[in-house]
Amino acid sequence: MLLKAKNNNYMYAKTTVNIRKKPSKKSKNIGKVYWNEKIQTIKKANKNWYKIKYKKKNRYICAKYLKKKPYKCKTYSSPSSNSFKSFEDADCITDSTKLAHGRLKRKYHLDYRSGVWMVGNRYCIAVGSFYAGEKVGVKIDLVLSHNGRKHTLKCITADSKANKDTIKNHRVHKDGSVAEFIVKTSALPKKALLMGDVSYAGKQFKGKIVKIKVYK
């Protein structure tokens, strides 16, 4: 018997998960959802698979990668009213897989439109130690405000800003930037390179950072 999905018909991904055409790992891969993304469940197809709604069609996802509630975060107000967003070339980050920085770096893929490196659906950044210590792989949502509208930019820590270079209890860099983006300098749009500001790398980066949501 097929079981109805609970929790208002929504669940959340524990990690990056493939969406299948049929309830089998051998079935065609239709797409994917990322960590903590909300998924509309229809019912449980069997003990291992959920039937879900994906792009207006019925698809399937492995049940063990879903959870009933979203991951919790701690929200901070931005310590800076500056819209400036600095950048760091990925070549400045170690390639050594003996360190967490290097292991995460192996997962990088480039957003060719902006020149900013990503892991999954999250942009790679460095922030002050107030938010994540010196840890890499910490998921952070930056809430930006531009022309009176707010939007969320999903990020992940790939490096940390040195305490000697930060102010306001290590929450903001001395140059006024809250987040420093990890980039491939040669792939940056010309204006972003000229201004030294990732805000000019794409519309998703525009605006002031008003909230910083840190997932623990």
Predicted regions: what they are:
Residues 21-23, 54, 142-148:
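Short acidic, glycine-rich loop/turn motifs
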Residues 30-66:
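SH3/SH3-like beta-barrel superfamily modules
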Residues 1-18, 31-35, 43-45, 67-77:
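SH3-family beta-barrel domains
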Residues 24-28, 127-128:
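Short, solvent-exposed loop/turn positions at domain surfaces
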Residues 16, 47-49, 178:
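A generic structural signal for beta-strand entry/edge sites
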Residues 13, 40-44, 157, 209:
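A structural signal for short, hydrophobic beta-strand segments that form beta-sheets
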Residues 75-216:
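Solvent-exposed, well-ordered loop and adjacent helix/strand elements within mature globular domains
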Residues 28, 34-37, 135, 174:
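Residue-level recognition of short, solvent-exposed, well-ordered loop/turn junctions
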